[in-house]
Amino acid sequence: MLNILELESSLGFGGQEHRTQRVINGLDKSKFKVFYGLNPGSKSLEKQIECEFVEFNLKKSFNILEILKICKFVKKNKIKIISTHSGKDGIIGAIVSKITGAKVVRTRHLQTPIRSPFSYNINDKIVAVSNAVKTQLISQGVQESLIETIYTGVDTDKFTPHFKKDIRDQLGLPTNSIIVGIVAVLRAAKNHKILFEAFNELNLSNTFLVVVGDGPQYENLQNIKTSNILMLGNRADVSDFLGSFDLFVLPSKMEALGTALLEAQSCAVPCIGSDVGGIGEAIKDNETGLLFENDNKDSLKNALKTLIEDANLRAKFSANARDFIVENFSIQTMVRQTEKMYETL
């Protein structure tokens, strides 16, 4: 039995915490036992995660008393691997590793610049969620030999082409209308603004842009939306109707991978994405969707017009999309690769 201590200093439950949940739940419980070290009040404590929760004070990187407490826990529970995800828990985990002799693995979920390569190079292994993230780490001085890419996996049983709800029925739209969809937090980096502008300028008949998500850009986007743009806010039932989109767009200025694109393609929805970060790995250009030049409105307009007006091309991409995700981005693939990595440390 290989005992693992996951550490996560974040209090929220976003993309990286969701990935950690999926990995923990998917691990072979006859081979791996997981303890999950979290701050008191962490939203992960409320989730269905197949582990033993442990509360630590992870709010400061150099809390000596807490580090010693974690060291004691590691020795008592014969922890062999410490897995970290964020800045503070990454430093804590590395220090505990050096004191106790446990191996330490750092997962990098973002493509934003890192503060110091040293805090990564002291790990035994670094997991990058895309090759784009791996390349960015190397460019900042992280040792290539330490890095392994393990793509984030999506629930291909939950996100299927067989949608339970047609978004047209819910919104009172014509049954033959074309639905362009986006599911993303309304923040500047997701670049909804360029999508709204491109969609408005195309002004195609019987075509609607459905926007799922909320965030700080809500008011700004409300000011430029037209009657053919429908903003639904946050929805808990996205997987039920995602498959009824005719195409999905993610125009982010920066993206480590783009999990929303994976979920859409798992539902056999063709995608359009900006050619930045890991999006070029999440979309197979001209096979499951189209890439456009990052932050280039004309390039986005061309991609939108092409897919909106060409039903045969949409059907071709749709037929390829589901298989592409099942083969490369399933939870099972992510978990098996993680298990193999743990066993070879």
Language-model features, listed with the residues they occupy:
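N-terminal strand-loop element at the rim of the active site
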Residues: E6-E66, E148, Q217
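A conserved mid-protein helix/loop that constitutes part of the nucleotide-sugar donor-binding site
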Residues: G14-R22, I178, I182-E201, P216-E219, ...
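Short hydrophobic beta-strand element within catalytic cores of glycosyltransferases
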Residues: L38, P270-G273, I283
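A conserved, positively charged/aromatic
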Residues: K98-N131, T135
